Amino acid sequence: MSKYSILFLFTVLFMFSCKNSNEKIEQVQKQEITLYTHRHYESDKVVFEKFEQETGIKINVVKASADELIQKLESEGKQSPADLLLTVDAGRLVRAKNKGLLQSVNSKVLDSTIPSYLKDEENKWFGLTKRARIIAYSKERVQPEELTTYEALTESKWKDKILIRASNNIYNQSLLASIIANNGKTAAKTWAEGMVTNFARVPKGNDRDQIKAILAGEGDLAIVNTYYIGKLLNSKNPVEVNAANAVGLFFPNQDNRGTHINISGIGVTKYAPNKANAIKFIEYLVSKEVQEIFAQTNYEYPVNALANTSELLTSWGNFKEDHLPLAKLGELNKAAVITFDEVAWDKGPNAQ
């Protein structure tokens, strides 16, 4: 072999060695995940920082509304840097799945930790935390013994008493979707009509506003998510604390299907460049320790049965959940939106 051939061989070997070294360095540097999230809670920031410290995996957080994130994933396609989509409401996760934006995940940890009704049957999304949609009532003007079910809110004794958000709110859409799933479309429409008749005002504001309106005497009942009560009770604003203290919590439908629940949930995106790390992150989020952080700081119920709830959540008592598979909320979302429109929900009691 000539000296030129030997030199060429060493050059090739050197370049190959450098290439492998660069690839290994690049792999080490890419110990990261990119998270598209709709959530905006301080608890999440705490959890993300703990994950980074414990694993060395960096989290690149991109925040926007759920609709914006789903649209972003669609437009980016195979070029998307996203590994995960985190949002509230199962219906949104179903929509992302139906658009082909999520992929199946194989994880013994997730299979054994998360109940089947709180996740996608193809493991394309998973519930991380639960929130119950309950009836908040004025402690001064309503006795809890007067309350029973969502359906009973249409009784005439509640005329001009009910406060609630507008129909474009995803929590209301999912509640109505659950009523359609359990009772059928005809009964659900009758319920929605009865609710409109009993509205105290035109639907407006967020869940916190409904609770404040009870304190202000604008109505006696409101349908809200439990974690908002926790946030108001722990607010630095005394007006919000007073509003939360003025209401009691009632978990409806305890003698039949149980109280409607919804979730914050997550899925691995279809073209996730860091799939293994993404799965590791989801497994971390449903661990006992992290689930208890969500319960303590964001007043959400754990999906992990081994996790303890916070003292506040425990004080509200145990309750029976509606175990309707949450995928149904997405499947019936369109029917719920149509029903709201048919009964003129947003025009309030004067519409009928």
Language-model features: where?
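Early extracytoplasmic/lumenal segment of secretory-pathway proteins
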Residues: N20-R95
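Short beta-strand->loop
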Residues: Y36-R39, E121, Y137-K139, E145, ...
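Periplasmic solute-binding protein
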Residues: L93-L101, L118-T148, A177, I261-G267
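Extracellular/periplasmic bilobal clamshell ligand-binding domains
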Residues: E311-Q352
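A structural signal for short loop-to-beta-strand junctions that line the ligand-binding cleft
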Residues: S80-L85, Q103-Y137, E151, K161-I164
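Mature extracytoplasmic/periplasmic domains
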Residues: S264-L324
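C-terminal motif of bacterial Sec signal peptides marking the signal peptidase cleavage site
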Residues: M15-S17
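Ligand-binding pocket segment of bilobal, Venus flytrap-like solute-binding proteins
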Residues: S178, N183-F251
